Amino acid sequence: GKTGLAGHSMGGTIAFRIAAQRPQDVAFVLSLAGAAIPGKDLMMHQCEKIILSQLPATTSDSLRTLYEELYGTMALPLPLDSTRHRSTPLMVSIWQHLGINEGTYRENLTDSIRRRKARQLTGQAISPEIASIIQYDPSHDLSRVQCPVWAVNGAKDLQVLPEENQKAIETLAKGSPQVVTHIYPGLNHLFTEAPTGHPSEYGLLKGNFSQEVLQDMAEWIRKTVGAPQTVF
């Protein structure tokens, strides 16, 4: 028989990809804040909400240009070493603007040591996983999904912006017989109640995954594929 797929964040994006590649095996997709826009745009929107919005306008304007160039570079279909090489000066400029890792730029360090430290930091920041996210455009896979889709976001999600993400799903998933989208007020990317939704709050929140979301998910599965209602 067919299998239903559920995924959170990039897991939701991967669920769409599997559903597109193996339509004969997938009964439905549950996307919990699964990204439906190109990775480069996703990262830039995260940057706007999580980093740039917290900074003075003069700083954020300069950084915005650097981040746009960085993500544009990382989106190019290049070997990872080439991507890291091209990205290093951009990341150094970003870190200098943010005052991060200032030890890398101390005057008493030689240029060769500074360059080596910058390469090390860039190598850590630009992993194969991050590069693959930025280079991936889910639109092709979404347009090939043939199963029912239930896609939800929290209204305070700053990592996968709810309105634009759900609009993309509704627009692209034309092959699906049923697309249900919903935005839950007060919930963050983790589907917990949150003051602002900023990731810096994650470790401080004491609530659990929303019971309302779980109940709605179970009800949708029951109505869509006739499965027994699950009690959470």
Describe these PLM feature segments:
Residues 187-190, 196-232:
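Catalytic active-site module of serine/aspartate enzymes centered on a nucleophile-bearing elbow/loop
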Residues 156-160, 189:
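Acidic catalytic loop of the alpha/beta-hydrolase fold
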Residues 147, 161-172:
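Short alpha-helix in the alpha/beta-hydrolase fold that links the catalytic acid
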Residues 12-23:
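Short glycine-enriched nucleophile-adjacent loop
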Residues 32-143:
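Accessory cap/linker subdomain of secreted extracellular hydrolases
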Residues 145, 151-153:
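Short beta-strand/loop motif that positions the catalytic acidic residue
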Residues 1-9:
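Alpha/beta-hydrolase fold nucleophile elbow
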Residues 173-196:
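Catalytic histidine neighborhood in serine/cysteine hydrolases
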